């Protein structure tokens, strides 16, 4: 709705006032199926950006037109706030499998893309390309976030496919002159398939998914956002409803990649 769009514009202005300079916008996600009768087809999911490549993909209950998203980025640029758009895949992708069920994973759940299906790559290539191509792309900034958050690591073959997917989309966005940003996942997804690290930025959010010392050794640039300290998920029960401001002010620095024991 227009209210939420105005809120995002206001957020950019507030960030600039407080000298905050980076806003990552997570454009797709979904609920947990246990809250929707254990039925993936009824589980809430949304992708929030207009798409001409895939008409009808954008959520009916609210999305940004391409022009609105471009204008938001221009506002941010004028205020020296960097917007990093994120399309999260190959997990958190129920909005995409609602739209195209054949690319959903039968084994790991429909919120996971099927990494063994070539159609998955065709779909995601088409989606990223829409916002990256042309002289005035929809994704205007220097960085693009490709997701890679919380995919299953139950079997070695799927881990290798996940690593290949990650490497593919790092290089895909780089092909359009962008710097790739990823969620930390490569300790969770240890394997043999190489994943590009040079000039790649990683969200270090949970050490069990990406051990910071290992990731730095491997060549990644890290953004320190330890979930146990800086995540707010109201009423979830496993993260803060409000930040622990006294602790953060007195004790935390961005060099601390873990929560206090």
Feature locations, PLM:
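Short glycine/threonine-rich loop-to-helix capping motif typified by GTGT followed
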Residues: 152-165, 192-207
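Active-site-proximal beta-strand/loop segments in catalytic clefts of secreted hydrolases
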Residues: 86-88, 149, 183-186, 205-206, ...
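Conserved small/polar residues in nucleotide/adenosyl-binding loops
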Residues: 2-7, 257-261
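Flexible, acidic glycine-rich loops studded with aromatic residues
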Residues: 14, 194-200, 207-259
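Substrate-binding cleft of carbohydrate-active enzyme catalytic domains
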Residues: 5-176
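Structural recognition of the beta-strand scaffold that forms the well-ordered cores
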Residues: 24, 144-145, 180-182, 201-204, ...
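Acidic/polar loop patches that form or flank catalytic/metal-binding clefts of enzymes
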Residues: 174-184, 212, 222-226
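Acidic, contiguous N-terminal accessory segments
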Residues: 180-189, 196
């Amino acid at each position: 709705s227009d209210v939420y769009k105005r809120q995002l514009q206001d957020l950019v202005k507030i960030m600039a006032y407080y000298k905050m300079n980076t806003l990552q916008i997570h454009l797709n996600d979904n609920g947990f199926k246990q809250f929707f009768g254990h039925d993936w087809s009824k589980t809430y999911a949304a992708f929030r950006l207009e798409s001409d490549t895939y008409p009808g993909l954008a959520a009916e209950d609210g999305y940004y037109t391409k022009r609105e998203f471009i204008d938001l980025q221009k506002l941010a640029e004028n205020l020296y706030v960097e917007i990093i758009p994120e399309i999260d895949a190959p997990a958190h992708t129920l909005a995409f499998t609602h739209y195209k069920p054949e690319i959903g994973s039968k084994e790991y759940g429909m919120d996971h893309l099927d990494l063994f299906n070539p159609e998955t790559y065709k779909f995601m290539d088409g989606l990223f390309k829409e916002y990256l191509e042309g002289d005035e792309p929809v994704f205007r900034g220097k960085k693009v976030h490709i997701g890679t958050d919380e995919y299953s690591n139950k079997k070695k073959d799927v881990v290798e496919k996940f690593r290949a997917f990650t490497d593919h989309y790092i290089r895909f966005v780089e092909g359009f002159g962008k710097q790739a940003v990823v969620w930390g996942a490569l300790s969770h997804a240890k394997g043999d398939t190489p994943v590009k690290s040079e000039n790649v930025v990683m969200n270090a959010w949970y050490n069990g998914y990406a051990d910071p010392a290992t990731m730095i050794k491997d060549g990644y640039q890290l953004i320190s956002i330890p979930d146990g300290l800086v995540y707010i998920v109201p009423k979830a029960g496993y993260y803060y409803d409000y930040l622990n401001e006294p602790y953060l002010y007195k004790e935390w620095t961005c060099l601390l990649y873990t929560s206090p024991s």
